[in-house]
Design a protein with these regions (language model features):
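Glycan-recognition and catalytic cores of secretory/periplasmic carbohydrate-active enzymes
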Residues: 1-171
Length: 171
């Protein structure tokens, strides 16, 4: 997917950066330190969260993704050059981890309410916004779970999602 961006040329000289811009850069530096510290201390080499237990209910998949969901946004705003790749690595690692814990099938929540699925998907949404060429295929595949009746979520006659707990394995 090719994105066309307009050329923008600055025409007003800037003698000194405004205070808000300096504060924003200081915040980005602080956030850069924070995400690196978190990744070093609380995740494994493949991006998984350090979690060695089992899950005892359907709830919880969203919590694994939520710690990373704003990393692509920070990257887009001017965060570290390696932040987007790290966010993707953590999505991959957490997705593998949750698959092993039985929470996902085909990289998607097996079946839970839409509110929690939406929380799980925030990271993917922002990864797709930041790097559509890499992530848009997954977004389309996941959307097909809700528009293709063969997946069991969508009832084309009534034009509704068939049950409150739905996903990649809704039955």
């Amino acid at each position: 997917m090719t994105i066309t961006r307009p050329d923008i040329t600055a025409s007003v000289p800037l003698l000194e950066p405004p205070g808000w811009a300096l504060a924003e850069r200081a915040l980005f530096d602080l956030l850069d330190h924070a995400w690196r510290h978190f990744a070093r201390d609380f995740t494994g080499p493949d991006g998984r969260l350090t979690y060695r237990d089992t899950l005892t209910s359907r709830d919880g998949a969203d919590d694994f993704y939520e710690v990373f969901f704003n990393w692509p946004q920070l990257y887009l705003l001017g965060g570290a050059d390696d932040l987007l790749a790290e966010a993707g690595r953590h999505w991959e690692g957490v997705t593998a981890q949750l698959t092993e814990l039985g929470m996902l099938a085909g990289e998607y929540e097996r079946g839970y309410d839409w509110f929690h699925q939406g929380e799980s998907l925030l990271l993917l949404y922002f990864l797709t916004m930041a790097d559509p060429a890499r992530w848009a295929g997954r977004a389309v595949r996941f959307a097909e779970l809700y528009v293709d009746p063969a997946h069991g979520n969508y009832d084309p006659v009534r034009r509704i999602i068939r049950r409150p707990h739905n996903g990649s394995d809704p039955d």
